[in-house]
């Protein structure tokens, strides 16, 4: 996959400024194309990374009970409007066969997946699927809560409205008690 083409983004931003009736040579926006290009390279950096790579570092721990990392902040861009959505991800898994990954690896996986034009539903399922594929745990549950600027600043204009998505894999799919336990841990501050 090609890397971000900064020059092409700069050109496109100049065209947008012209298309909305602004002067791209005006002092206040003269460097805007460069700034936007650099920002896009950063916020879309996940396009050029494999999120599963973070999960390959495992520790041979004989732990086969719940691991939960909650309130992992993330920022992403809605693929429909290219405006931000942001929130927190809660990632729970039940290790199997001594495959326990570092806690930071779960956060890095969320970040890599979020840093692309995205849908919240896809972030949620891709995190769960990546963990299932690499760590082969007994089960995974991912809960993502986010506010979408496409709902806040345009369209229905509902600031503060949160969207919650879930993905459940493995033994947790058929274990309501375990899912409820995870949800109760997530609610605990």
Curated annotation (Swiss-Prot):
Pathway: Cofactor biosynthesis; 7,8-dihydroneopterin triphosphate biosynthesis; 7,8-dihydroneopterin triphosphate from GTP: step 1/1. Toroid-shaped homodecamer, composed of two pentamers of five dimers. The keyword Iron-sulfur does not apply. Zn(2+) binds at residues 78, 81, 150. The keyword Zinc-finger does not apply. Pfam families: GTP_cyclohydroI. Keywords: GTP-binding, Hydrolase, Metal-binding, Nucleotide-binding, One-carbon metabolism, Zinc. HAMAP family: FolE (MF_00223). The gene is folE. GO terms for molecular function: GTP binding; GTP cyclohydrolase I activity; zinc ion binding. Its EC number is 3.5.4.16. It catalyses: GTP + H2O = 7,8-dihydroneopterin 3'-triphosphate + formate + H(+). NCBIfam families: folE, PRK09347.1-2, PRK09347.1-3. Gene3D superfamilies: 1.10.286.10, 3.30.1130.10. InterPro entries: GTP-CH-I_C/QueF, GTP-CH-I_N, GTP_CycHdrlase_I, GTP_CycHdrlase_I_CS, GTP_CycHdrlase_I_dom. It comes from the Bacteria. This is GTP cyclohydrolase 1. One of its GO terms (biological process) is tetrahydrobiopterin biosynthetic process. One of its GO terms (cellular component) is cytoplasm. Belongs to the GTP cyclohydrolase I family. PANTHER family: GTP CYCLOHYDROLASE 1, GTP CYCLOHYDROLASE I.
């Amino acid at each position: 996959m090609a890397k971000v083409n900064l020059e092409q983004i700069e050109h496109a931003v100049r065209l947008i400024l012209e298309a909305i009736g602004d002067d791209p040579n005006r002092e206040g926006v003269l460097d805007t194309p460069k700034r936007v290009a650099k920002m896009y390279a950063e916020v879309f950096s996940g396009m050029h990374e494999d999120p599963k790579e973070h999960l390959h570092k495992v520790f041979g721990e004989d732990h086969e009970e719940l691991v939960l990392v909650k309130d992992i902040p993330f920022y992403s861009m809605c693929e429909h409007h290219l405006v931000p959505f942001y929130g927190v991800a809660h990632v729970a898994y039940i290790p199997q066969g001594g495959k326990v990954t570092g806690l930071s690896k779960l956060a890095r996986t969320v970040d890599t997946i979020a840093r692309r034009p995205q849908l919240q539903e896809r972030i949620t399922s891709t995190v769960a699927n990546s963990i299932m594929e690499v760590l082969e745990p007994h089960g995974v549950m991912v809960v993502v809560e986010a506010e979408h600027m496409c709902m806040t600043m345009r369209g229905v204009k509902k600031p503060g409205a949160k969207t919650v998505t879930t993905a459940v894999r493995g033994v947790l799919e058929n274990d309501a008690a375990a899912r409820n336990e995870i949800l109760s841990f997530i609610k605990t501050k």
